[in-house]
Amino acid sequence: MAEQLTEEQIAEFKEAFALFDKDGDGTITTKELGTVMRSLGQNPTEAELQDMINEVDADGNGTIDFPEFLSLMARKMKEQDSEEELIEAFKVFDRDGNGLISAAELRHVMTNLGEKLTDDEVDEMIREADIDGDGHINYEEFVRMMVSK
């Protein structure tokens, strides 16, 4: 996954890694991670810090080296990309920009995609995604529907 990063991104992440790696030994410990987190206004417990490290500690040595850090950053960026893609997709459906997808908006987009749906089929799609029962699909409902596919 780290292969998808540009040289510029890798250089930026190397700088960030150096900020975490206080003693310059090439690894980030829970202590170093805690120091940086606290400087950013967070107050994680020792267990939370260990969990964060364990999440990316591929070789299981209890610390994060630069390749592990790059892997974490690449994963976070990929999550960010898919979030942006969902927002863009939602905007396509939400034609009037009111933050809700109505049956008419859904029907219009589906028709433009070549899907000829009956009113009942469109209503059924809305009902399936419409968790709060207001007759429209809001962004959270849209995300839940897209992610559960």
Swiss-Prot record:
The keyword Endoplasmic reticulum does not apply. Ca(2+) 3 binds at residues 94, 96, 98, 105. The keyword Metal-binding applies. Ca(2+) 2 binds at residues 57, 59, 61, 63, 68. Residues 8-43, 44-79, 81-116, 117-149 form the EF-hand domain. CDD domains: EFh. GO terms for molecular function: calcium ion binding; enzyme regulator activity. Ca(2+) 1 binds at residues 21, 23, 25, 27, 32. The pantophobiac mutant CAM2 is undermethylated on Lys-116. Belongs to the calmodulin family. Calmodulin mediates the control of a large number of enzymes, ion channels and other proteins by Ca(2+). Among the enzymes to be stimulated by the calmodulin-Ca(2+) complex are a number of protein kinases and phosphatases. This is Calmodulin.
